[in-house]
């Protein structure tokens, strides 16, 4: 398999001290596994995956300092030392005082979003673009998630901050229906729109609009460090700032926060809710006790709190972030140079293939992003994830409304794979699209869950044509 070399591949700023064997199953075996999984890559076993780019959430490698911190975990039910170290790390790195740990990000979304929807007695939640779990949480609590991506987000040409919210559309919504809006949400970085960063100017403008209409501004900050690094890289005004200072500046404009520590906490599990409102904090704390655990552990072991505390301090180190962003960019450059259409510029955690351009002949009703994900696994053993019609299409007035984007996401776990893994992925996908478009078979849904917004996780599919 030809691999296109790069003149400047990124150099890993770490040594490998422990390894996990991986193996590439024969194609016939991969086909059998795919059939058993209902042609849904979420349902595959990890031992049957050669290179796993399904998600960067909780799948990265921890540092020796995080492993050492695990051994100091205090497992007391209440008031554990590990809780105080976790709290202090959130304060020091992010500048947030009122924090509640939870077992992962979607628990934070469920508790915070549910409380805000009840308090405002309003349903609409505008966002730069909702990600799948947050969207599902809002839908299943009676809310209406509304995507207002930047006009530049859907354009192929590079633009530094495609993750922004469309301020003009947001302002128009607030002028017409502010009473129906529960809160404004910024997802940082904007995962669904290609892992793109949100600019500081956009955050400041949204803050002004929130103040003008008396609305809370909520931030999903699970990739706060990657966003801050990209601001430093793409906005000349912040070139001399540290990543930590940029992150704290951006976070200073928010009211309430959700965080999955499985991303920029560099941990395998965990998350938190934070707020600036003491009254809301008390109500959220009660919900955490009811649904997650006591307020000083929130469903996590003390050792997990220790790993997150250390991870939050490591994630703002610029040597780490430079390699993180450059490795993902390297994968993007390899794909683009071989003719694979991707969202540009490449964001912080993943490369997104524009499937509508890659497979223009396939109708949206055949779920092209997920069809490409299945074909990529079958032909190479690589697992990626489709983010398109299967995940985000909805029925409205008896008709199917398809999302603006149909993307294949190649999410790179942190500190886990090397450049040669990226080269294998790029060569495999480029070959599939160059030589084997006929191998990408459209899919139909055989079975799906009744709960809204999660069918791409659990659906069983089958090819429309024989494989």
Curated annotation (Swiss-Prot):
One of its GO terms (molecular function) is tryptophanase activity. Pfam families: Beta_elim_lyase. The modification N6-(pyridoxal phosphate)lysine is found at residue 263. Keywords: Lyase, Pyridoxal phosphate, Tryptophan catabolism. InterPro entries: ArAA_b-elim_lyase/Thr_aldolase (IPR001597), Beta-eliminating_lyase (IPR011166), PyrdxlP-dep_Trfase (IPR015424), PyrdxlP-dep_Trfase_major (IPR015421), PyrdxlP-dep_Trfase_small (IPR015422), TNase (IPR013440), Tryptophanase_CS (IPR018176). The keyword Lyase applies. HAMAP family: Tryptophanase (MF_00544). Belongs to the beta-eliminating lyase family. This is Probable tryptophanase. The lineage of its organism: Archaea, Thermoproteota, Thermoprotei, Desulfurococcales, Desulfurococcaceae.
